């Protein structure tokens, strides 16, 4: 019998029924819920006279619309307030677990799930949010779903899905100082393109991946969707198991050994066949900075903004020209000469404790440059915020001139009070640099937390590995 990939194993173990036409009914183990994609789903449930099939499989948290400044004043925007209040009401009425805005465990759903141990190896995990792929770092099959599918999961705990093809991204070599998992995933997307993973589930493997922390692996899987993939996966190892031990939703000490034995089987077989294999030399990577309006428009810190005239494909050339016009950049500008106005360290990609520690190392002993209008640090959850404050990271940021905020999605997307003004340029640790993503006319450059911190103190993009030399 031919070997199975990790994705094959996860898929096969959750198929309830195979249908003609290539689709299958999949059982869903964990459903994460937030305020933006759930109101219509709850209303559909109510109109049909249905109740959630398995209440305990759901975990809800408001994140997209919540304010990151003084919460005693409530939510000022009426639409945002209505969505958060609807989530509170729906969860209370239906008996679903929710970490409300005033709960110390509240935060971004893709940070809260893992830190609570609600994401476990071998699970299927869904959420009405495209960056659900984050949870694949735990050897779980995790993907984003639409509002109608949110209702389906609530009602039946199942979803109709079509199986993806298998892609392996094999990464070897040691990441250089100042180069992080964010740089790695940006370089991967630049290599294969934003459509390179379309129709695939990507497994990230190799010595470089095994050396990453769980935080680093989550960053990698978080942006698999930006390469067009349905999901991203990392096989289970001791790093996974050590991270999960003792978490609130993790197996009890009594059943821990049995769970670990099962989890350790969540690997691709040595003779498993992949539909596509991509190899990456991590040791050759420099810190990455996006220059355009797509996550594939990326250059190394020692590079330049590319010249569209050198692109032979007319469609790509036109896209590059439009991107440069929107971004207010000239071809051949050195990346290190680009000067951001705003610094944003946060989002489900890079707002975990490790991210804040790395940024704080860069900031310590420095001040935010005079040309920076605003520098924000937004922890990914209340628990991350508390841990950072215990370590004194908040004081390092505040002394340098950063604002220290409450947890939430914040400036990743223009759905709350944190947003860019037209033509403001932001060094952002988030995952998308589309036109208007951070605010109408706002210009986004995707970077790692360390690179965002370096840009804050230098006033321009600079190689973080040489900042203090």
From Swiss-Prot:
Q: What class of enzyme is it?
A: lyase
- Cofactor binding mode, per the note? Binds 1 [4Fe-4S] cluster per subunit.
GO MF terms listed in the record are: 3-isopropylmalate dehydratase activity; 4 iron, 4 sulfur cluster binding; metal ion binding
Question: Where does this protein come from, organism-wise?
Answer: Nitrosococcus oceani (strain ATCC 19707 / BCRC 17464 / JCM 30415 / NCIMB 11848 / C-107)
Which EC number applies? 4.2.1.33
Keywords from the named record: 4Fe-4S, Amino-acid biosynthesis, Branched-chain amino acid biosynthesis, Iron, Iron-sulfur, Leucine biosynthesis, Lyase, Metal-binding
Q: Look up the record and give one Gene Ontology term from the biological process aspect.
A: L-leucine biosynthetic process
- List the pathway annotation: Amino-acid biosynthesis; L-leucine biosynthesis; L-leucine from 3-methyl-2-oxobutanoate: step 2/4
Give the family, as the similarity comment puts it. Belongs to the aconitase/IPM isomerase family. LeuC type 1 subfamily.
Report quaternary structure and partners. Heterodimer of LeuC and LeuD.
**Which protein are we looking at?**
3-isopropylmalate dehydratase large subunit
What is this protein for, i.e. what is its function?
A: Catalyzes the isomerization between 2-isopropylmalate and 3-isopropylmalate, via the formation of 2-isopropylmaleate.
Q: Which gene encodes it?
A: leuC
Task: Cite the NCBIfam families for this sequence.
Answer: leuC (TIGR00170), PRK05478.1 (NF004016), PRK12466.1 (NF009116)
- Cofactor(s) the protein requires to work: [4Fe-4S] cluster
In Pfam terms, one family for this protein is Aconitase
Query: Where, by residue number, does [4Fe-4S] cluster bind?
Result: 348, 409, 412
The keyword Nucleotide-binding is assigned to this record:
no
Reactions the enzyme catalyzes: (2R,3S)-3-isopropylmalate = (2S)-2-isopropylmalate
């Amino acid at each position: 019998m031919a070997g199975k990939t990790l994705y094959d194993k996860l898929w096969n173990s959750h198929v309830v029924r195979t249908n003609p036409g290539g689709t299958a009914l999949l059982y869903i183990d964990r459903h994460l819920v937030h305020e933006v994609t759930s109101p219509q789903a709850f209303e559909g449930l109510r109109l049909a006279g249905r109740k959630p099939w398995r209440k305990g499989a759901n975990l809800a948290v408001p994140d997209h619309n919540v304010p990151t400044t003084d919460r005693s004043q409530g939510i000022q925007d009426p639409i945002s307030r209505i969505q958060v209040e609807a989530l509170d009401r729906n969860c209370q009425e239906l008996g679903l677990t929710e970490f409300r805005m005033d709960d110390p465990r509240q935060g971004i759903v893709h940070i809260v799930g893992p830190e609570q141990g609600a994401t476990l190896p071998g699970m299927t995990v869904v959420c009405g949010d495209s960056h659900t792929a984050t949870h694949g770092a735990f050897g779980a099959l995790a993907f984003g779903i639409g509002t109608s599918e949110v209702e389906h999961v609530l009602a039946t705990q199942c979803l109709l899905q079509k199986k993806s093809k298998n892609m392996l991204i094999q990464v070897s070599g040691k990441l250089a100082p100042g180069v992080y998992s964010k740089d790695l995933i940006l370089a991967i997307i630049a290599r294969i393109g934003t459509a390179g993973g379309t129709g695939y589930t990507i497994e990230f493997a190799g010595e470089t991946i095994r050396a990453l922390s769980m935080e680093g692996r989550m960053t990698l899987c978080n942006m698999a969707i930006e390469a067009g993939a349905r999901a991203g996966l990392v096989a289970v190892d001791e790093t996974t198991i050590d991270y999960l031990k003792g978490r609130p939703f993790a197996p009890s000490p009594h059943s821990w050994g049995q769970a670990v034995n099962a989890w350790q089987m969540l690997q691709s077989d040595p003779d498993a066949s992949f539909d596509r294999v991509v190899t990456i030399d991590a040791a050759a990577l420099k810190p990455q900075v996006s220059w355009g309006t797509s996550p594939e428009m990326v250059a190394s810190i020692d590079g330049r903004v590319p010249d569209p005239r050198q692109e032979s494909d007319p469609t790509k050339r036109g896209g590059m020209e439009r991107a440069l016009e929107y971004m207010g950049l000239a071809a051949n500008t050195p990346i290190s000469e680009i000067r951001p106005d705003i610094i944003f360290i946060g989002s489900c990609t890079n707002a975990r404790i490790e991210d804040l520690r790395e940024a704080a190392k860069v900031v310590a002993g420095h001040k935010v440059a005079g040309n920076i209008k605003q520098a924000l640090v937004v922890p990914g959850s209340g628990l991350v915020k508390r841990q950072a404050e215990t370590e004194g990271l908040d004081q390092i940021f505040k002394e340098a001139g950063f604002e220290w905020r409450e947890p939430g999605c914040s400036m990743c997307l223009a759905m709350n009070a944190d947003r860019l003004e037209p033509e403001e340029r932001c060094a952002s640790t988030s995952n998308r640099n589309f036109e208007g993503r951070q605010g109408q006319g706002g210009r986004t450059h995707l970077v790692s937390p360390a690179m965002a911190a370096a840009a804050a103190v230098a006033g321009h993009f600079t190689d973080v590995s040489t900042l203090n030399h």
